[in-house]
Regions:
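N-terminal subdomain of nucleotide-sugar transferases
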Residues: 1-51, 106-108, 160, 398
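Donor nucleotide-sugar binding/catalytic pocket of nucleotide-sugar-dependent glycosyltransferases
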Residues: 24, 133-139, 151-200, 208
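Acidic donor-binding loop of glycosyltransferase active sites
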Residues: 285-300, 317
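Short hydrophobic beta-strand element within catalytic cores of glycosyltransferases
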Residues: 309, 314, 318-321, 331
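Conserved acidic donor-binding segment of nucleotide-sugar-dependent glycosyltransferases
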Residues: 333-334, 338-345, 354-359
Length: 399
């Protein structure tokens, strides 16, 4: 629920008249999501897993209560569910088994798990005789660090039992194919943006105006903020009228602030921390260039599609990013963005300088970026595609 792109799928399905129930690991609707919650009453649609660890007697009591709610047919399925849980107990906790019983009681047409590990958590349900269709969406870390940690066969049973597997980019698709995901059940559904909520503005640089650079992303190694900070400090030697704002929170905050202090860059580079959605939209409106310097982390973690790149292009920003994961697919190099190799501070700095020196190109780059998003990342079109996938899964299950 903390991922905006998941929320946009949920609200899009509700807008189309479908009933959606949400099963979440823990409470925590972030503040910037409450505006959606007011309209859609999402909290009343959300079921949270019981707190962990529960005493054994509480688990038995809750299991008995959930089983009592089941219809006789579902009770029969629950026996198969228990057997499936036992087979998959290495990747499904007792709490998640209780959630599976709750899902079983709901008699849902479709069970859609976002991120591969969540697909594994409902795997016991897939291995019963329930008629629900099972869809799993892969995003990024689930085909990189998760696989590195648990092995290349971690999704073997999921690939056997699932009905459809969606992915956000060709880069993610290639990783899934290497893991032996059945190609005939793979479908691309990119993560989009609501264009009516992402206001567009052509970017222009007036004489003497400060160049506003913006980064949006968690303060973790994978986001590569260190390299952008070093690059901007180099650019400052050439252009004095520059400011760089970094949105996000994370465990690298202290190290990044120490780097800013070391470079004596505090007057023009600022860590803003986490911001609300309305504050983020305001930052998009006033920025000229989005800097997104992601890298492959030391543990192998990589981004997937790069949703921030989509948001920025929709707003008309010029983009500077790295050749990381699916980024060359999400932007159009040379037309909507400039790309640099990962961890290459000099290349990042050169690209910032190039963009500033070619500021007359910004309006055309912004218009092309908006059109690119309208054609490929309009969440309304993507949600229509998602409904088609659901319908195809159900048609196949019924045949």
């Amino acid at each position: 629920m903390s991922e905006t792109f998941v929320l946009q799928q949920i609200t899009g399905l509700l807008d189309r008249g479908h009933d959606v129930q949400i099963f979440a690991e823990k409470a925590g609707l972030q503040g910037h999501l409450f505006a959606e919650n007011d309209q859609y009453n999402l909290l009343n649609r959300t079921h949270y897993l019981p707190p962990s660890p529960l005493p054994r007697w509480r688990r038995w009591a809750q299991t008995a209560w959930l089983l009592a709610r089941l219809t006789p047919t579902c009770r029969s399925s629950s026996l198969r569910l228990a057997a499936a849980y036992y087979r998959n107990r290495r990747c499904v906790t007792p709490r998640q088994f209780l959630a599976c019983i709750d899902i079983l009681a709901g008699s849902f047409d479709i069970v859609h798990a976002h991120f591969g590990p969540n697909g594994l958590r409902v795997l016991p349900l897939m291995q019963t005789d329930v008629r629900s269709g099972f869809v799993t969406t892969f995003h990024g870390y689930d085909v990189t660090t998760y696989v590195n940690r648990y092995g290349r066969a971690v999704y073997e049973a999921l690939f056997t039992s699932g009905d459809a597997f969606t992915y956000n980019s060709q880069a993610t698709a290639e990783k899934l194919v290497k893991l032996h995901c059945p190609v005939e059940r793979m479908v691309k559904v990119a993560m989009g943006v609501k264009l009516d909520r992402q206001s567009f503005r052509e970017r222009r640089l007036e004489p003497g105006e400060t160049v506003n650079l913006l980064s949006v992303g968690r303060l973790v190694e994978m986001k590569g903020h260190e390299y952008a900070i070093r690059a901007v400090s180099q650019v400052k030697e050439r252009f004095s009228n520059i400011r760089y704002s970094i949105v996000g929170s994370g465990k690298e905050a202290g190290n990044l602030q120490a780097l800013i202090d070391e470079l004596r860059a505090g007057e023009y580079i600022e860590l803003l921390g986490a911001v609300s959605n309305s504050q983020l939209q305001d930052l998009y409106r006033h920025a000229h260039i989005l800097v997104h310097p992601s890298v492959t982390a030391s543990n192998g973690n990589m981004e997937g599609q790069g949703v921030v790149l989509v948001e920025a292009q929709a707003a008309g920003l010029v983009v500077l990013a790295t050749r990381h994961s699916a980024f060359p697919e999400t932007v159009i190099e040379g037309e909507t963005a400039l790309l640099a190799p990962e961890r290459d501070v000099n290349a990042l700095a050169d690209n910032v300088i190039r963009l500033i020196e070619q500021a007359d190109r910004w309006p055309a780059m912004g218009r092309r970026a908006r059109r690119h998003v309208e054609e490929n990342y309009d969440v309304d079109k993507l949600n229509d595609r998602l409904v088609e996938i659901y319908q195809n899964v159900l048609a196949t299950k019924g045949s």
